[in-house]
Amino acid sequence: MGLIINPYMVVAAGASVTPPFDDYGNPTAGYSMRKLDSLYSGSAIRVREDSGNTEADIGFDGSGDLDTTALLAHTSSNSGFIVKWYDQSGNSYDITQTTTASQPKIVDSGSVVEINGKPAILYDGSDDFMVQTSSMGFNGSTAEVNHYSVQQMLSSDTTSIYIGGQSNVYYWVYTSGSSSTAIDSYCGPPTFYKNGTVISSPTRGSLFTAYNTDAQTLASLTDLNMQYFNTTPTTNFNISNALGGSAGWRMNAYVQELLFWRATDLPTQADVEANINSYFSIY
C-alpha cells in the first residue's frame, strides 16, 4: 500500500484519516499512539526497557503511526514501560511517571501491547498511574473542557477512577453493580457518551456496564469543570489515580488516545468522534 504525505494530512492510499488537530485547532492537550498534528515534530512516548533500564524517545513512522520498529529496536526481547507520554498540542503538558513500579506497559517481552491491531498502553490495576503536574492551567472561565479517549476497560476491574487529582477531585468513577450517582467530585457533572451515544442518568454501575466490556470503546465526556484540578492542594492531573494516591482506585485498562479541548475552543463533538472512529475502527 503506497503512502501519500502532504503538510496537512497523513494518507494511506485507500484509507485517509486527517490528524485531528489539523482540522480542530487550539486543543488543550493531546496524547496518542498516532500523530495528532501533521506539523508536530516531537516524539509520541519515552520508553524504559526493563533489562538495562535505558530510556529512548519513540516517534512516528511515515504514515503517522507509532514507530513500532524503533520501539522494538529499543526494547528487543525485553518489556517496555512508559516514562513519558508527550503532549502533542504544543502546550507541553506531558504526562510522566518516574517510579519504575508505577509505569504502565507498552511492550510485553518483545511484543508490542495492542488492542484492535494498534499499540496501546496497559495500566495494570495495581500500582500504575501517570501524572501531569501543572494541571493544564485549568481555572475559572477556562476550566470547562471536553474529554475524548480511546480505551479498553476490563470487566475484571470492578472499581476504579480514570482521571483524578488529590483531595477528592476526580471524575469517571465506575463500580460494578453500584447505583451511586457520585461519578465525579468537583468536576461537572459531566455528560458521558459511549461510541457517540449518550449514557442517560449515569451511575457508577451503568458506567461499568457501558465501558468495562473487554472491548475497545470511544468515550466522550462533555461539560467537565476542571477548575479544582488547579486549586491547592490539588496540583496534579492524574491518569488512573485519585483520592490522594489511593492504590485501591487504580484502573486495569488499555489506553490509546486522550484528547482535551476547552469550551472556548470546542470543535463539533460528532466531527471529533468521526475522526477518532475512522482511525481506530471502533464501531
Regions found by a protein language model. Give the residues of each.
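Short, low-complexity N-terminal tether/leader segments at secretion or assembly junctions of large
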Residues: 1-13
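N-terminal module-boundary/linker segments of secreted carbohydrate-active enzymes
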Residues: 11-50
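Extended recognition patches within non-cytosolic domains
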Residues: 13, 257-283
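Low-complexity, highly charged intrinsically disordered N-terminal segments
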Residues: 37-84
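Short, solvent-exposed loop/turn segments at the edges of secondary structure
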Residues: 40, 116, 144, 234, ...
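Short amphipathic beta-strand/extended segments with alternating polar/hydrophobic composition
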Residues: 53-64, 132-133, 173-174, 193-203
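Extracellular glycan-interaction patches encoded by glycine-rich segments
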Residues: 230-256
